[in-house]
């Protein structure tokens, strides 16, 4: 699958900025399949299938977070269920790995369309 620059252009921030991912960054993002897909296969959240990883759902998550997992509404910490804080699989992920995974999550809806996140 060859991804042109248009597809590899993903949101950078909430002010409308974008960034073009390199093919190497796209490849590194496949770390998602190793580290996250057990609970988020295809961008669907195993524990709450009403909340996926599609851009619209991510935009509505409050507060914005990456390293402190909470429920979608931000009310409850979920570090006791598989997450970055508790699972052995996440202990070796660096900030660069997390960035690559986040880029993958932003790229997938552009690659697979509405299949990502189950919507």
UniProtKB/Swiss-Prot annotation:
Entry keyword Electron transport: yes
Cellular-component GO terms for this entry: photosystem II; plasma membrane-derived thylakoid membrane
Single Gene Ontology MF annotation: heme binding
Entry binding sites for heme c: 36, 39-40
Pfam families: Cytochrom_C550 (PF14495)
Keywords, comma-separated and alphabetical: Electron transport, Heme, Iron, Membrane, Metal-binding, Photosynthesis, Photosystem II, Thylakoid, Transport
Known partners and oligomeric status: PSII is composed of 1 copy each of membrane proteins PsbA, PsbB, PsbC, PsbD, PsbE, PsbF, PsbH, PsbI, PsbJ, PsbK, PsbL, PsbM, PsbT, PsbX, PsbY, PsbZ, Psb30/Ycf12, peripheral proteins PsbO, CyanoQ (PsbQ), PsbU, PsbV and a large number of cofactors. It forms dimeric complexes.
InterPro entries recorded: Cyt_c-like_dom, Cyt_c-like_dom_sf, Cytochrom_C550, PsbV_cyt_c550-like
Record's keyword annotation contains Hydrolase: no
Listed name of the protein: Photosystem II extrinsic protein V
Any Gene Ontology biological process: photosynthesis
Membrane topology classification: Peripheral membrane protein
Cofactor details (free text): Binds 1 heme c group covalently per subunit.
Family, similarity comment: Belongs to the cytochrome c family. PsbV subfamily.
Cofactor: heme c
Source organism: Aphanizomenon flos-aquae
Role summary: One of the extrinsic, lumenal subunits of photosystem II (PSII). PSII is a light-driven water plastoquinone oxidoreductase, using light energy to abstract electrons from H(2)O, generating a proton gradient subsequently used for ATP formation. The extrinsic proteins stabilize the structure of photosystem II oxygen-evolving complex (OEC), the ion environment of oxygen evolution and protect the OEC against heat-induced inactivation. Low-potential cytochrome c that plays a role in the OEC of PSII.
Cellular localisation: Cellular thylakoid membrane
């Amino acid at each position: 699958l060859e991804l042109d620059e248009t597809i590899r252009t993903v949101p950078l921030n909430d002010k409308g900025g974008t960034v073009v991912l390199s093919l190497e960054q796209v490849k590194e993002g496949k770390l998602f399949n190793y580290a996250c897909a057990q609970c988020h296969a295809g961008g669907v959240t195993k524990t709450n299938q009403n909340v996926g990883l599609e851009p619209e759902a991510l935009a509505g998550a409050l507060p914005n977070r990456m390293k402190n997992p909470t429920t979608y509404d931000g009310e409850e910490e979920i570090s006791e269920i598989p997450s970055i804080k508790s699972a052995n699989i996440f202990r070796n992920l660096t900030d660069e790995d997390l960035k690559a995974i986040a880029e993958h999550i932003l790229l997938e809806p552009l690659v697979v369309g509405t299949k990502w996140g189950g919507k």
